[in-house]
Amino acid sequence: LLLLLPILAFFSLFVGSNSSSDTDINTNTPQQQTAKVIWDRVLKEGGTKEGAAALLGNNQAESELQPSIIQSNATYNEAKAMDTTLGGYAFGLAQWDSGRRVNLLNYAKSQKKSWTDTNLQVEFMFEQDGTDSTLLKQLVKGTNVKQTTEDIMRKWERAGAVDSLPKRQGFAEYWYTFMTTGGDSGTGGGSGITPDIPSGWTLDKPINTSGYIASSYEYKQCTWFTWN
């Protein structure tokens, strides 16, 4: 038996991420909290951590993980929202459009909840989006972050702008690291954010944080600097 232990330890390195929920992840912002809801649901459905990160990467590219967002920051219009033939007016985390948008709104009404509710949208994503829910449950079982991100983009999101794939994969890798290292420590280490310039360092001019592309990352996160 003792001889088998090193062998078992070796093979364990190649086993995919387990599907148990991580309950000790620190989340300090609405975006992080939304990400945690999606992450936990993927694992509950038997998906992998890689699959959860891949879905988050796609969702962030679509909506910045803001459940209330409407495409192009448009305002809500009931007539337009309930028109199944109208495209380019996408709603929510996955930017559901046309018939899928109407299905989301009808589901929200049936539950007597706002369509902007994160938990409602995640439930719709996995249980109420017809064959796309079945497809998503399979896709999130992927074990490679980059490939699973691409599979979700092409097969489930069916994104028009496929040139956004590298950005989606970057987001996915960020969330994989964030969720598997305990989240936001809030101490300036790991994924945390520190508002201060380190002791002994100075800036020769103020940093202008406006107009940068990575608005979905909080200023002074390491990923903000990477993207900018």
Regions picked out by a protein language model, each given a short descriptive name:
Residues 23:
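Conserved short loop/turn motifs at secondary-structure junctions
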Residues 30-107, 123-126, 188-228:
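Secreted/periplasmic proteins that engage bacterial cell-wall peptidoglycan
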